[in-house]
Amino acid sequence: MGRVIFHIDLNAFYASCEELRHPEYKGKPLAIGSKDRRSVLSTANYEARKKGVHSAMPVYQALSLCPELILIEGDFNYYRALSARFFSCLKKYTFKIEPASIDECYMDVTEIIKQYKRPLDLAFQIQQSVLNETGLSVSIGVAPNRFLAKMASDMRKPAGITVLRISELETKLWPLDISLMYGIGKKTVPELKKIGIQTIGDFASAENETKILQLMKNSGYALIQKARGHSSSQLHYSYTQKSCSVSKTYSSNIYTLKEAFDKVKELSIELSNRLKKDNQKGKLISISLRDLNFHTIVRSQSLNQYTNQPQIIYEIATNLIESNFESNGYRYMALTMASLQNANQIVDQISFLLFL
């Protein structure tokens, strides 16, 4: 059996994060960016994309295409907290994960997929687990290597799962427009089309190789091999944790601050114990609450010093809850520590600074 690689991508990540805490925006065109008309957008949700709005587009142009566009300035601490929850969720399955960015990664599931009767069951389980724990949807590409997994995850968005086998390149990959090939820049696309390369299949064709290499020089060869299905399946992953999470779904609703504080005390102790077991300390604490209508709020706070102490975690978490609590009845709570570092390294750094 060859390798099985998942590419997992959070759909319209920043925009989806904002829809989580502003459910009234769901179904409406929304983009992340400054309200300064001369600035550019970071991202846009799928409703905005249907209107022609996309990332890196100037705000004035986006508003001319979509006057009803909702503009929100980015809250990157909030996005990082949700990203940490996403990666913590995935690490329950395997540590063989290579982050590609804040909202996507590659996962080598070659070994763990053998535990499932049907290979796609693992993909469905991960998709549902991420949704349950973060409120965010993911698309998953399943393939024997990194490039094909990345291409597969882009084929069905949002919330799709796509398998791309080597035997399916001719029917699934090669008919796609060359502009959709990962690794081909926007400026290169028109140059390729000038020499007759319209599709990924044209790019993979042996008869076009010479003229592609004349245009793209050395970079063209590796991309041609990828289009033919030949790409590395080796991931560059580290067993170093970036975050640690604990969560619980409760059988009875949480309506009062006292109840919430009691629950978060239990989670603070559990999180502290996990951090101490792994000899980790962190500097970014986030709390997530989900109500009966599946509306999720996530709040985070950065610390001045690394910690794994339950009383500090509890104090920060209760402050975050108190300033954002609504008595709507919460069923789910999660507590995350991110920006982790080995506790011994922190001691070494302090000792070094004292020596200076």
Task: Place the predicted regions along the sequence by residue.
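Gly/Gly-Pro- and Ser/Thr-rich, intrinsically disordered tail segments characteristic of DNA damage-repair
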Residues: 1-214, 220-221, 343-345, 351-356
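Extracellular/lumenal ectodomain signal focusing on beta-strand-rich modules
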Residues: 104, 332-334
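DNA-contacting surface of Y-family translesion DNA polymerases
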Residues: 7, 180, 188-332, 339-355
